[in-house]
């Protein structure tokens, strides 16, 4: 409280979600408690209530480990590669809209995604997971699909969900997930 925390990132490996059967109600309660604490402490020393809500962030892309945090209770969405393979920005926007609506309903207001990596080569070894977390290998179409997905997130989330696309240029061609080890890009 005294550290003036501006936000939190919720992750299943931090035990922010316990058990599949109660994950969503527990998550909503956790977020509500965090925001209430923020509200109560924002005005404790002031006569005027100046409340800025906490940023509650999460990574949630396609209901698969290790990139997703909430694995039960929300709509199962296709991977970015599946969406990208359609060459239809309408599908990307629709998937983003569904996710934005569900994140907003839970109280999550910061989304880490989608991946805007450009996959330069097919990987069949340890790095293959990167292949489904990108819209494809053409920079133009990855940009178009990402733009539509983000538009859907904003509209579905009633413009209450901020979006931070990931990762860095070239990481779509790395040999391992950056969350596991330092990736090598060749």
Regions found by a protein language model. Name each.
Residues 104, 154-157:
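Anion (oxyanion) recognition and catalysis
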Residues 2-142, 167-185:
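Enzymes and membrane/adaptor proteins characterized by extended Gly/Ser/Thr/Asp/Glu-rich
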Residues 156-172:
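Aromatic-lined carbohydrate-recognition surfaces of secreted/lumenal glycan-active proteins
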């Amino acid at each position: 409280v005294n550290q003036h925390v501006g936000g939190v990132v919720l992750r299943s490996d931090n035990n922010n979600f316990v058990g599949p059967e109660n994950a969503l109600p527990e998550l909503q309660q956790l977020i509500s408690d965090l925001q209430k604490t923020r509200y109560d402490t924002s005005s404790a020393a002031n006569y005027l209530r100046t409340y800025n809500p906490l940023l509650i962030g999460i990574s949630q892309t396609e209901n698969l480990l290790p990139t997703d945090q909430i694995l039960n209770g929300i709509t199962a969405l296709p991977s970015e590669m599946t969406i990208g393979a359609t060459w239809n920005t309408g599908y990307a926007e629709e998937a983003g809209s569904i996710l934005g609506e569900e994140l907003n309903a839970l109280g999550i207001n910061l989304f880490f995604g989608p991946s805007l990596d450009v996959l330069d080569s097919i990987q069949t070894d340890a790095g293959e997971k990167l292949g489904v977390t990108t819209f494809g290998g053409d920079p133009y179409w990855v940009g178009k699909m990402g733009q539509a997905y983000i538009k859907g997130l904003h509209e579905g989330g009633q413009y209450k969900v901020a979006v931070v696309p990931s990762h860095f240029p070239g990481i779509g061609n790395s040999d391992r997930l950056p969350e596991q080890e330092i990736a090598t890009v060749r």
